[in-house]
Amino acid sequence: MLPKIFKPYKSIKKNLIRVGPNTDGGYVIDKRVIKKVKTLISCGLNDDWEFEKEFLKINPYCEILAYDHTVNKKFWKNRFKKDLISFFLLKKLRLRKILNIFKYIDYINFFKKNNKHYIKKVVLKSKNKKEISIKKILKNKKNILLKIDIEGDEYKVLEPIKKNFQHIYLLIIEFHNIHKNIDKIKKFLMKSKLKLIHIHGNNYSGINKNKDPNVVEMTMLNSEKFKLSKNKSKFKYPIKDLDYVNFKRRNDIELRFND
């Protein structure tokens, strides 16, 4: 079972909305923040910006800033080769998969003007030009929606996130290998003004021997900017019609909490 502190605070269901696809890359947020967000910052991009695209449709006035050092020219060359081989081996016959071969065109079209992708690694303290600190990313920005999926490095940037909470309206964060880092997550949840309003187990990474997910997606709301119940949620997770599996060939993970 997951620790009691992993159970979200009570939300009015009509305030919860899913943004992005009904699969991996979609997240549940509080819709009250949408129109108030001025900057959406994504740390960790890979080849998926569907969340950012849909968010921009709802709030066309916000800027999108993405940081990912792995998405470079080499990344796109390798991806195109792989997709092309799959196509000729008849592994990409569905229209969506065929269109994915030309994902780079979508990337070029999306990341322009107010939408920017920086080929930099997100770190606690930068040591060279290829890195950028989370503190610098957040500097001089207000009304932020911060989305973090940096494959285990999220634990290194929790402290500056906690200290700069006043500028962050909503935090979406994926915690990896949670059982090895459970105390770090608990400490962050206890001391942060960003309060947990939603949790989902990412079924891509499977479960441990106790049937708990190895990776969780958490959504946290700034409790000083938005009204939030002091009571814990009574929802069963995953929430029907809000949560969807990341990997369609596996069942979603039912979450259980220590009460």
What are these model-derived regions, one by one?
Residues I12-N128, K141:
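SAM cofactor-binding core of SAM-dependent methyltransferases
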Residues P3-K7:
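Preference for solvent-exposed, low-hydrophobicity sequence contexts
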Residues T39-I41, F51-A66, K77-N78, I134-D259:
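Conserved acidic-Pro-Pro-aromatic motif
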Residues L124-K129, N203-I207:
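A short acidic, often aromatic-flanked loop/helix-cap motif at beta-alpha or helix-coil junctions
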